[in-house]
């Protein structure tokens, strides 16, 4: 997973609250076995409207989504995070996130930055008045900047650390590869074990 320190990109004001995972990506788009290629399904029900924000330049090139409260509610589907990332988003800013969405985001390299609703309103105003305005998200200092405007955001320490280090679940496991190997050596031969790499990769 790519590490995240700071990101600067066009902000997208999504003036909608309670955006659930089925609205983020409808279930019909989940019928694949890969983890990429979900961008076509992102907000598919809304993108049929030519005036939807992601159909308008320069917002269609945005990478920082500023949404209403309770973003990512509904069913637990990692595809919601994958669709946002595949479209090009690196950050979602909102005043409240569904817990499962926030967890999935952190594991997949998407920053879920929680700010006060008053700051969401301020960012919406700036982005609508200045289309193409770039937001700078600084994970180390937990701030979002828009020109001279700087607002703080919340993210838990553990998720922040994982994002800064670029560690997904596999990356975390591989940090313990020596301990895992030693454990495997001590296991009785009659117990289940992993296949040698040359066999499992064949």
UniProtKB/Swiss-Prot annotation:
<comment type="pathway">
    <text>Amino-acid biosynthesis; L-leucine biosynthesis; L-leucine from 3-methyl-2-oxobutanoate: step 2/4.</text>
</comment>
<keyword id="KW-0456">Lyase</keyword>
<dbReference type="GO" id="GO:0003861">
    <property type="term" value="F:3-isopropylmalate dehydratase activity"/>
</dbReference>
<comment type="function">
    <text>Catalyzes the isomerization between 2-isopropylmalate and 3-isopropylmalate, via the formation of 2-isopropylmaleate.</text>
</comment>
<keyword id="KW-0432">Leucine biosynthesis</keyword>
<keyword id="KW-0028">Amino-acid biosynthesis</keyword>
<dbReference type="Pfam" id="PF00694">
    <property type="entry name" value="Aconitase_C"/>
</dbReference>
<dbReference type="GO" id="GO:0009098">
    <property type="term" value="P:L-leucine biosynthetic process"/>
</dbReference>
<comment type="subunit">
    <text>Heterodimer of LeuC and LeuD.</text>
</comment>
<dbReference type="InterPro" id="IPR033940">
    <property type="entry name" value="IPMI_Swivel"/>
</dbReference>
<dbReference type="InterPro" id="IPR015928">
    <property type="entry name" value="Aconitase/3IPM_dehydase_swvl"/>
</dbReference>
<dbReference type="InterPro" id="IPR004431">
    <property type="entry name" value="3-IsopropMal_deHydase_ssu"/>
</dbReference>
<dbReference type="InterPro" id="IPR050075">
    <property type="entry name" value="LeuD"/>
</dbReference>
<protein>
    <recommendedName>
        <fullName>3-isopropylmalate dehydratase small subunit</fullName>
        <ecNumber>4.2.1.33</ecNumber>
    </recommendedName>
</protein>
<dbReference type="InterPro" id="IPR000573">
    <property type="entry name" value="AconitaseA/IPMdHydase_ssu_swvl"/>
</dbReference>
<comment type="similarity">
    <text>Belongs to the LeuD family. LeuD type 1 subfamily.</text>
</comment>
<dbReference type="GO" id="GO:0009316">
    <property type="term" value="C:3-isopropylmalate dehydratase complex"/>
</dbReference>
<keyword id="KW-0100">Branched-chain amino acid biosynthesis</keyword>
């Amino acid at each position: 997973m790519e590490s995240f320190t700071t990101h600067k990109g066009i902000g997208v004001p999504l003036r909608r609250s309670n955006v659930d995972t089925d609205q983020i990506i409808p279930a019909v788009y989940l019928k694949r076995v890969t983890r990429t290629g979900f961008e076509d399904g992102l907000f598919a029900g809304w993108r049929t409207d030519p005036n939807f924000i992601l159909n308008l330049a320069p917002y269609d090139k945005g990478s920082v989504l500023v949404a209403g409260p309770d973003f990512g509610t509904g069913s637990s589907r990692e595809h919601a995070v994958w669709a946002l990332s595949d479209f090009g988003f690196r950050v979602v800013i909102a005043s409240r996130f569904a817990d499962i969405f926030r967890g999935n985001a952190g594991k997949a390299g998407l920053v879920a930055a929680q700010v006060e609703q008053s700051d969401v309103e301020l960012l919406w105003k700036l982005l609508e008045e200045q289309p193409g305005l770039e937001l700078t998200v600084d994970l180390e200092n937990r701030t979002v900047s828009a020109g001279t405007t700087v607002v703080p955001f919340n993210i838990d320490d553990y998720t922040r650390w994982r994002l800064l280090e670029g560690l997904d679940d596999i990356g975390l496991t591989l940090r313990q590869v020596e301990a895992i190997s030693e454990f495997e050596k001590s296991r009785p031969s009659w117990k289940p074990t992993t296949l040698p790499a040359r066999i499992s990769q064949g």
